[in-house]
Amino acid sequence: MSRTESEPHIVIVGGGFSGAAVALHLLRESRRALRISVVEPRPALGFGVAYSATDPAHRINVPAARMQLAGDDDGAFDRWYRRHGDFPQDPQAQLADGSVYPQRGAFGRYVQENLAQAIKAYSGSLTHIRERAAGWHDGCVITAEGQRLRADGLVLAVSHPPPRLPKVVQHVAQHPRLIANPWRAGALAAIPLNARVAIMGTALSMADVVASLHRQGHQGTTLAFSRHGLLSRANAPLAASAWQASYQTGTLRQRLRQIRADIPRAAAQGLPWQAVLDAVRSQGQTIWQQLTEAEKRQFLRHLRRFWDVHRYRIAPQVAQAIAEKRADGTFRSLAARLQALTVEGEVFCLQLAQRSGGTVWQEVDYLVLTTGPDHADLVASQPFLTALHQDGQIRPDALGMGIEVNAHSQAVGASSRIWVAGPAARGRFGELMGLPQVAEHARQVAQTVLQTLTSRQNVTA
């Protein structure tokens, strides 16, 4: 047996940020040589859906100083961006307080550079397999082109599942003016400057669509609607200090009451409400795992939509684009449900049932869907995950948020060699969508994989 064949082989399915971060920490922290294979069809690792964005209007949603890989020095990405990124060519990135909100692709390049450095600096090897994982058989990942990758450890770092096409629009699924995937390159470019646009969904993706239209010089009307009509809030200027408070005791209702009471207390100290929410976020995984199953379901049913629009905020530049369109009368939002959709020639006729009561009819030239990932159907969204599920290796979590895992992020199933990294594990950990949490989780998964490999080696030695 060759030295390479005797080295443990870790297969990572998914090469976006989560997968690249796991690979990086495996390389950095392993005390023995490893073979790492990352199965990812995109041409480069570390970008994924979020950081593959090429539209200059799409910016990172938090200041660069808060974007980093776990284990990096504070502000590492901010310093890299100012020295090596596109900072000189992007004057709009910097705000009056000195903070910078780079275009999203910059962070993907930062991750890619760190990964390349780790490959050179450490003893492990990394192979990027530009395919999709398609099947699973007898401990092997089978790619779409038939490669068989025997895995001593498998890490699922899968991307967000695609949105589910709402039933009310399925009969126009092939209509050229229905934009079901606004992330597709050039998807919005064909919209004329004076076209009337409706956007189904009012959260982060909607904000990106409006920012793109604004950058293109769109002058037509834009209507964004969702059942509750809640828009993502903007980030505040960097605060001089953080809000210090613990939210790790009490029932869900008691914690909510404390958070609400702390917002005016923080304001009295000159801190915005965002500082309080950031304190909650930093304790989010602990809080989530302390809640009862009934409280988790209560949160998902009644509070999640409010948490999401306050927790997952938009860059000030994006907020400004929305504000400008609202000020000139070309943007409005509505709390409404799409009851019916008809087509007359090239015009969509929307029948909207308002949350406040009554019905509104709206004619638009384009309908854009930004309803978000369909996490409840994650396992069914990819053939590889379906194969793992059918083999008893993984199963959906009980809350419909992703894949069921244990406290070590191991998939609950027939094997002890499968881990889940990133948002697909949030049914267990809760707060696992923001980059700082995903980065730290990736490091923890890498450490657990390495510890497991070491334990097996000691047993067989």
Task: Pin down the residues of each PLM region.
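Flavin (primarily FAD) cofactor-binding/catalytic cores of flavoenzymes
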Residues: S2-V49, Q92-G250, R257-S455, A461
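N-terminal glycine-rich dinucleotide-binding loop that anchors FAD/FMN and/or NAD(P) in oxidoreductases
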Residues: S52-R79, A240-R255, Q317-V318
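Dinucleotide-binding Rossmann-like beta1-alpha1 core, especially the glycine-rich loop
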Residues: D55-G71, G75, G85, D90-L115
